[in-house]
């Protein structure tokens, strides 16, 4: 075993058998709003490009103010097409998707290098919209 410098992270990665670098896991945290303003629905609320190719292994969303009256629903798109067959949701009165009654389902896990990623807000709470949305992308590379 040895180590190999990873220019994407600036870290030394474990090198597996035969000199091949072990897979690297990253978590991208994307702020989709400020902390206090009510969320509004819309497409491409956030747009960014993938810094490297990777496999999407999990997604999560959190808010600082919970939606009230209905769930907050978020979609994640690569090049304009959803990567989720069941969208990411935060249930009424909750602050995280980790406890969602219906968890998100990833239908397209392969994210290309430099792919345009957009985050849509499809639904906000009907009484209180929710605020402070962050979306987490769990990515494995290598």
Regions found by a protein language model. Give the residues of each.
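Glycine-rich, low-complexity segments
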Residues: 2-40, 57, 77, 81-95, ...
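Generic, low-specificity signal for short hydrophobic/alpha-helical stretches with a mild N-terminal bias
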Residues: 32, 38-41, 99, 103, ...
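Beta-strand-rich interaction surfaces with strong enrichment in secreted/lumenal proteins
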Residues: 33-37, 45-48, 105-109
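Beta-rich globular "head" domains
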Residues: 44-78, 120, 134-140
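Extracellular Ig-like/FN3 beta-sandwich strand-entry sites
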Residues: 53, 112-116
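Terminal beta-strand-rich extracellular "head" domains
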Residues: 62-113
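Short beta-strand-plus-loop segments that form exposed binding edges in beta-rich domains
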Residues: 119-127
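Extracellular carbohydrate recognition
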Residues: 126-134
């Amino acid at each position: 075993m040895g180590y190999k410098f990873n220019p994407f992270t600036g870290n030394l990665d474990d090198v597996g058998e035969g000199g091949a670098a072990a897979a690297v896991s990253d978590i991208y945290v994307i702020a989709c709003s400020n902390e206090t303003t009510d969320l509004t629905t819309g497409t491409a609320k956030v747009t960014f490009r993938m810094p490297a190719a990777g496999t999407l292994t999990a997604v999560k969303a959190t808010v600082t103010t919970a939606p009230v009256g209905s769930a907050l629903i978020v979609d994640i798109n690569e090049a304009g097409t959803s990567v989720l067959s069941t969208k990411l949701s935060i249930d009424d009165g909750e602050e995280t998707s980790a406890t969602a009654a219906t968890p998100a389902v990833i239908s397209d896990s392969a994210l290309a290098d430099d792919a345009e990623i957009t985050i849509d807000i499809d639904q906000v709470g009907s009484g209180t919209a929710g605020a402070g949305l962050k979306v987490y992308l769990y990515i494995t590379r290598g």
